[in-house]
UniProtKB/Swiss-Prot annotation:
SUPFAM superfamilies, per database record: Acetyl-CoA synthetase-like
A GO molecular-function annotation: medium-chain fatty acid-CoA ligase activity
Coiled-coil stretches noted in the UniProt entry, renumbered to this chain: none
CDD domains for the chain: OSB_CoA_lg
Family, per entry: Belongs to the ATP-dependent AMP-binding enzyme family. MenE subfamily.
A GO biological-process term: fatty acid metabolic process
Keywords: ATP-binding, Ligase, Menaquinone biosynthesis, Nucleotide-binding
Name of this protein: 2-succinylbenzoate--CoA ligase
Signal peptide: none
Biological role stated in the UniProt entry: Converts 2-succinylbenzoate (OSB) to 2-succinylbenzoyl-CoA (OSB-CoA).
Length: 485
């Protein structure tokens, strides 16, 4: 029996899903899903186990996810900001034959000749629910999301139903989520932060209010009027909500915000505390199916700056470069182990990320205090997190260095008031090339959020003793010595 069916049996008339001015109970969700199942049965072969989805947040995407899971399909979630080249790589790497896209994406998708493109449009017919019900198998792959990693080569993360289930249970225990909660989802469903909210709904029986895009005015109005008890945010969203925070505050039913997706300025958290907004900082990634370390509501004010403690059944340790466990307050690499953590990447990429005894090497640096609260020092050392999106410098550097006229490139993150951080590029040219030419190539090969916001020409790069680029010097006044003026 699927998670949706269980909720229908328990609470058929309980509110389940809100989108714009529409609402559905769990029973009504199941009835709507039956139409979508019938639609996709007409275009997908039973033996086709993997399907790609390409859409911004919509009710159609939500129902498509549930319908395709009912049909036992593995779902490849594609970021709608990807360029044609990036889409092509992921579709080929995942060996997907069919991509289901929102109507507004059809023109772009028609340029991809090696897949069958199907519109995300429901057809008006239905089947008996028992005819298409699939037995749930927690070992099955539920979703695939690509993450670039430090190599710049995107890797498909294989997220199984058991990983999602453990994540939902851990969140329930940490945050006290019940069927009476309504989780506001203004983050993309193609990100783990968004999809995990759908899983929590199915597992815990809470309702979801989905937004097609984040609008701080609309979210604020909904929180004022009691239309949501919890919301997931990244730093950029939190800043925007603070800018329009009403004098009267939010509804008494509001529990708090779950903050993820990168660093936030301590003064913003202090503002939240002053206004009485509970904010739970958390730590997680695509490979852990959302947060695996988080604060509790009661600890939020006492442990500002900490990502919290491990959630239910999760283990964490800090090790040095030799793999030896570090004592408290000693910085080292963060290793994770537990049911939330995936067991591998698609096509067996980078198996060395997992130790022989099952620990996942995050590549992130941090330390634990005496009470085992985690403090992050850096994320993948060079990872740039901009508005909740991960940008891996290596990926951007590879695009820049493929441009005729660029001999070398280095990309770093610079602090930004709006986005938290933005990518900035330093290049060495070996022939005449203009800034406009570089920007044109970046716009063709990189999603908008990955494109360098500033590009500087250099005569040379600072180097370490071993000959590597000393990128940290680009983040100080020392960079002036290497720029062409």
């Amino acid at each position: 029996m699927t998670w949706l069916n269980k909720q229908v049996q328990k609470r058929p008339d309980h509110p389940a899903f809100y989108f714009q001015d529409e609402s559905w109970t769990f029973l009504e969700v199941q009835q709507e899903v039956s139409h979508w199942v019938a639609t996709y049965q007409q275009v997908l072969a039973p033996e086709e186990k993997r399907v790609a989805l390409f859409s911004k947040n919509s009710k159609e995407l939500y129902f498509s996810i549930l319908a395709l899971w009912e049909l036992g399909k593995e779902l490849l979630f594609l970021n709608t900001h990807l360029t044609l080249a990036e889409l092509t790589f992921q579709l080929k790497d995942a060996q997907v034959k069919t991509i289901i896209g929102a109507p507004e994406t059809q023109a772009l998708l028609e340029e991809i000749s090696f897949v069958d493109v199907q519109p995300m449009i429901k057809k008006q017919h239905s089947l008996s629910h028992q005819e298409f019900q699939q037995p749930s198998d927690l070992e099955s792959v539920a979703s695939i999301m690509y993450t670039s990693g430090t190599t710049g080569q995107p890797k498909g993360v294989l997220q199984r139903f058991k990983n999602h289930l453990a994540s939902a249970r851990g969140t329930q225990e940490n945050m006290g989520i019940t069927a009476e909660d309504c989780w506001l989802c203004a983050v993309p469903l193609f990100h783990i932060s968004g999809l995990s909210i759908v899983v929590r709904q199915l597992v815990l029986g809470c309702s979801i209010r989905l937004y097609d895009k984040f609008d701080e005015q609309q979210v604020t109005q909904d929180l004022q009027e009691g239309r949501g008890t919890v919301i997931s945010v990244v730093a950029t969203m939190l800043q925007q909500l603070l800018s329009v925070y009403p004098e009267a505050g939010y509804s008494a039913s509001f529990k708090g915000m779950l903050l993820g997706g990168g660093p936030i300025a301590p003064d913003k958290l202090a503002q939240c505390e002053e206004k009485g907004i509970p904010v739970i900082q958390s730590y997680g990634m695509t490979e852990t199916c959302s947060q695996v370390v988080a604060l509790k509501f009661e600890d939020a004010a006492l442990k500002i700056g900490s990502a919290g403690q491990p959630l239910k059944d999760m283990q964490i340790k800090i090790v040095d470069e030799l793999g030896q466990e570090q004592p408290e307050k000693q910085v080292g690499e963060i290793l994770l182990k537990g049911p939330n953590v995936v067991s591998g990447y698609l096509n067996q990429r980078q198996p060395e990320k997992w130790t022989a005894d099952g620990w996942f090497k995050t590549g992130d640096m941090g330390y634990l205090d005496a009470q085992s609260y985690l403090y992050l020092v850096s994320r993948l050392s060079e990872l740039i997190i901009s508005g909740g999106e991960n940008i891996y410098p290596t990926e951007v550097e590879q695009v820049l260095q493929a441009i005729t006229g660029i001999k070398a490139a280095a990309v770093v993150g610079e602090p930004d008031a709006q986005w938290g951080a933005v990518p900035v590029a330093y290049v060495i040219s070996d022939q005449e090339i203009t800034l406009a030419q570089i920007q044109d190539q970046c716009s063709r090969k990189l999603a908008k959020y990955k494109r360098p916001k500033r590009i500087y020409f250099c005569h040379s790069f600072p180097q370490t003793a071993s000959g590597k680029i000393a990128k940290h010097r680009f983040m100080t006044e020392e960079r002036e010595a290497f720029l062409i003026r």
